[in-house]
Regions:
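Short alpha-helical segments that sit at the start of domains
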Residues: 1-11
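Residue-level marker of regulatory loop/turn positions in helix-turn-helix DNA-binding domains and
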Residues: 2, 22, 148
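Conserved RecA-like P-loop NTPase ATPase core
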Residues: 9, 67, 211
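Contiguous, well-ordered alpha-helical segments that form the cores/surfaces of helical PPI scaffolds
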Residues: 10-15, 197-200
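N-terminal helix-turn-helix
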Residues: 15-19, 23-77
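Intrinsically disordered, acidic Ser/Thr/Pro-rich low-complexity regulatory segments
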Residues: 72, 79-242
Length: 242
């Protein structure tokens, strides 16, 4: 069973890897984290984390990177949703206050989420009244995937195809929870998206929004941004844009 100390080491590996994109070694953790233990002890604990399938060693490196299971444990047990700064909250409010109708607010929300998280943002339109029309969504930030080419490798093309078709994303967004939900890597039901993570939340009548990006993402920041934008969009709909 993973101890509190190992969880702290896992947190350090995730944080460092997300920030640097480089596999993480025991010395880097000892130098940057006040854990009060030696690099040798950290190496021993990392060996256990590797046995538990939470981290893995790339072929060309002495360091370790998180696995999908490691990210899942990080999100479930370690990651606290960090609040947005006052400046970020004001930026969201100001940007969305300029919207003059539902279509505008949905498109603005997608662009805003993509800009904040540097990932692909998807926003599903809410149902209006008894409308039985086809489901619609707005997508922004597709170019951000190209900047993640090293993370996504040869899976980039299938991901772009899935985004273009939209059917897969609409199905995933239809399963969105009223609270922020994270689907990581191999948990994705569509095999074309299993090098990505999806952070989603519902915000209105059969409506949802979220971001899609490589599994090496800032989960805490992405969860905070998705939650905050959903609150503002929900308020816009409830108050009729006032």
């Amino acid at each position: 069973m993973t101890t509190d100390r190992r969880l702290e080491i896992l947190r350090a590996i995730v944080d460092e890897y997300v920030e640097t994109q480089e596999p993480v070694g025991s010395k880097a953790i000892a130098d940057k984290r006040a854990l009060g233990i030696s690099p040798a002890t950290i190496r021993n604990e990392m060996a256990v984390l590797e046995e538990e399938g939470l981290i893995t060693q790339p072929h060309t490196s002495a360091g370790r990177i998180p696995t999908d299971r490691g990210y899942r444990l990080f999100v479930d047990k370690l990651s606290t949703v960090k609040p947005l700064s006052a400046a970020e909250r004001r930026a969201i409010e100001t940007f969305l206050e300029g919207a003059h109708d539902l279509d505008d607010v949905v498109k603005r929300s997608a662009k805003l989420l993509a800009d904040i998280t540097k990932q692909v943002a998807v926003v599903k339109y809410p149902k209006i009244g008894d409308s039985q029309g086809r489901e619609m969504m707005a997508i922004s930030g597709t170019a951000n995937l190209a900047r993640s080419g090293e993370d996504l490798g040869n899976t980039l093309s299938p991901i772009l195809e899935a985004l273009e078709e939209q059917v897969v994303l609409l199905r995933l967004l239809s399963d969105a929870h009223p609270t922020v939900h994270v689907t990581i890597g191999s948990e994705q039901p569509d095999s074309n998206l299993q090098s990505t993570s999806l952070v989603t939340v519902g915000y209105g009548s059969d409506a949802s929004l979220g971001i899609l990006g490589p599994t090496r993402m800032d989960y805490a920041g992405s969860m905070a941004a998705v939650s905050a934008v959903a609150r503002y969009v929900s308020r816009f709909i409830t108050e009729g844009g006032k």
